[in-house]
Amino acid sequence: MSRADNSAGLILASSPIFKKVFGKSNVGRAYDLPFDVQTRKFSYYNAKKQGLRTDPEYVRFIEDWAKVTFIVPPRMDKYISVNMEIQGIFQNYGSPNDIYPYSIDEGFIDLSSSLNYFVPEKQLSRKQKLDLISAKIQRDIWRQTGIYSTVGISNANPLLAKLALDNEAKKTPTMRANWSYEDVEQKVWSIPNMTDFWGIGKRMEKRFNTLGIHSIKDLANANPDILKKELGVAGLRLWFHANGIDESNVHKPYKPKSKGLGNSQVLPRDYFRQRDIEIVLREMAEQVAIRLRKIGKKATVVSIHLGYSNHENKRSINTQMKIEPTNNTDLLTNYVLKLFHNKYTSGA
């Protein structure tokens, strides 16, 4: 949580048990919680505002969980440092060309060229060898960083490895899972929620629903021509993915044309107070500044985009300005707020 000392502190990430106990999404505010983050006491004000129970049994339940909840500040510089350590571990098992960092906490490694070197036993299948080498990588990560890692594996392509990671590996005793083409009908098609599928968000799910598609199995068996006509190349690509087909390659990752560096958030509810919106912008500017300093770069252009709720009859805010090269947090924050103040009137 960023700025936990403030009632408007921003929840940037939450554990599954936190979401289940407190009924919250991954992102929110301290005042969205049914307890005070400082005292860990039940907040009757917040509870009533959200229509929650206030009976003694529920109060005890919330306070008991609040006492054992760890609230920690975001440390992007630390995350980047540990990420670099893990990338170094990957290079013990594959060349830099075989490694593709996907995000701050995920990455792909193609073990095709090194698999038989690390696991030379000829009697073992490729699937068994991949599992053994993945276990070695997990152990190395734990010994060097103290982090328990989860591994999605595939004999086929990066897509199935990612789906195995998101939908099975996190639930297995070994924290590993291997999905191949043979698993598509049984595992890929049975993914319970469409939004649990790589590349499908709430908006895309709604568009699929209007076409009568309500599951990954429905998508896999839909007419690809109709999907392309209604949703463009994105619809066709997801149809291929639903059938386990992925032509992406770790050795030739997508290289964006833009050299920009940014941060984005989809807020869990409407924000009406200008002060709350400014807090979000400040925190995002701070994270971008940290990342700029980490890679030794400076910004020369600052831009912001803010979208309104669907029921607000207002155009989104899109604006930018040229600045003197800087990676200073205070300066970048001031530029962001200046752009915001120049365009914002009111709304959520």
Where are these regions (language model features)?
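Residues that scaffold, gate, or flank divalent-cation-dependent active/transport sites
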Residues: M1-I104, F108, S113-L115, A242, ...
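Catalytic palm subdomain of template-directed nucleic-acid polymerases
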Residues: F108-Q138, G212
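Generic non-transmembrane alpha-helical segments
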Residues: D36, E85-G94, K136-T145, R207, ...
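Short acidic, glycine/serine/threonine-rich loops at helix termini
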Residues: L10-S15, S113-L115, L160-N167, G232, ...
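Long, highly charged, low-complexity intrinsically disordered interaction regions
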Residues: L132-T195
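Short Gly/Ser/Thr- and Asp/Glu-enriched loop/turn motifs at secondary-structure junctions
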Residues: P101-E106, I153-N157, K297-V301, A348
